[in-house]
A protein has these predicted regions:
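Mature extracellular or lumenal effector domains of secreted proteins
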Residues: 1-170
Length: 170
């Protein structure tokens, strides 16, 4: 999948695997970690997102849970938004492209990612101004043994151990 995505212009900007029970140490750590090792358990170049903003001011993202399959039969959400999720807790100009999972933390329609300002467990999530933090990216609060909060559709026992995030190179 990684090769296929890179051929199609997608750049991996984040990877978190808990196979070795590792978590980021804090929000700053989740912004940049092992920048030259995209297959590392903890990899992030989220601090470089602005480099991938398109000429029309938007980002096209893909958030993938490779070990999960949702009702759609897919494991990734693809969408466009104008807000940088590492900088803003307000998600703006959300446009779905192809959604595998469709509900955010509170059961409302999934509408992108923003910088978490409440909840205290991850850098970004799908309901950044609320206490629940699903679709979490940059988890530094070891929440459940070797797993972290994924999409609402996943129950606690099937929470993910792997998440990857990509941005489309314009």
């Amino acid at each position: 999948m990684i090769h296929e995505l890179s051929v199609l212009g997608w750049i991996k900007v984040f990877r978190h695997s808990t196979k070795n029970k590792e978590f980021f140490s804090n929000k700053q750590d989740a912004l940049n970690k092992n920048p030259d090792k995209p297959e590392a358990d903890l990899f992030s170049i989220l601090d470089k997102l602005e480099d991938f903003r398109s000429s029309d001011g938007r980002f096209q993202f893909k958030l993938c849970y490779p070990e999960a399959t949702f009702k759609s039969g897919k494991s990734c959400n693809e969408w466009i938004q104008s807000s940088n999720p590492t900088q803003s807790d307000v998600i703006t100009d959300f446009k779905p492209v192809d959604l595998a999972f469709t509900e955010e933390s509170y059961g409302k329609p999934w509408s992108g990612l923003g910088r978490a300002t409440v909840g205290g467990g991850a850098l970004i999530d799908d309901s950044p101004k609320q206490t629940h933090w699903r679709s979490a990216v940059g988890v530094f609060n070891k929440y459940y043994v070797d797993r972290f909060p994924g999409p609402l559709e996943l129950k606690l026992q099937s929470w993910p151990r792997l998440v990857e995030m990509f941005v489309k190179k314009s």
